[in-house]
Amino acid sequence: DGYAPIFAYIGTEGFLLDAELREGKQHSQKHTPEFLCELLHYGHKMTDKPLLVRLDSGNDSADNYGILLEDGSWFIVKRNPRTESKEEWAKHIKEWCKNPQTPREGKIVYIGTTWKDVTYTVEKNGQKEQKTIRMRIVYEMIERTIDKYGQILLMPEIELNMWWTNLGWSDADIIASYHAHGECEQYHSEIKTDMDVERLPSGKFKTNALVLDYPCIQHSQS
């Protein structure tokens, strides 16, 4: 199944903060809480400024929010709707959003905020305690009745994206900041191609994990 390494970058220049080699079959959230604690520790050693953590929908987990909230860090995490009905969300969003935008004929964009309770578990002095917090969800829903080529659609096409956050920024700034972290794909590419680790050399997982460490160190020094 190959490998699925996880990388964490800090700042705007692509400095690699932490990395971990994982088996391709491993779910993206497995062992992520431990990885998150580690990278927060490294981040606070590098700077005394507040940290903003951006995560993909594969890491939409109350465990992660608990760690980030207890740490005092900010976050933007792509929300995973799982089994929730897109149609039900669309119905509510049309009721909530007071200023939908129409960038062109047949395309309506709804942007706004709603709130939802999230319960997470913290462990103190060997005792587990549950905490519930009301968390912000920023949504962006695009409804298309005419596609970009002018073709009228038989049924409206709904595109829905949502993000968890504890920031007080505007909805538009939250969405823009999340999309900006797509630049990390460029850093992934540099490590894989420029440093020639597209294919790891060994049949042994631990050996490949060690091999990956070297280009990661070099990447942050270059």
Q: Which positions does each model-derived feature cover?
A:
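Acidic, metal-coordinating catalytic cores used for nucleic-acid/nucleotide bond scission
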Residues: 53-61, 81-84, 206
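Electropositive, glycine- and tryptophan-enriched low-complexity nucleic-acid-binding patches
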Residues: 1-46
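Short, solvent-exposed helix-loop connector elements
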Residues: 171-178, 194-210
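Acidic, His- and aromatic-enriched active-site or binding-groove loops in soluble protein domains
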Residues: 2-5, 70-85
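Short, surface-exposed basic-aromatic patches at helix termini and helix-loop junctions that form
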Residues: 45, 65-74
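Short, conserved catalytic/metal-binding motifs centered on acidic residues
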Residues: 1, 14, 51-60, 75, ...
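An anionic, glycine-rich sequence signature occurring as long contiguous blocks
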Residues: 77-187, 193
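A short acidic (Asp/Glu
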Residues: 61-67, 86-90
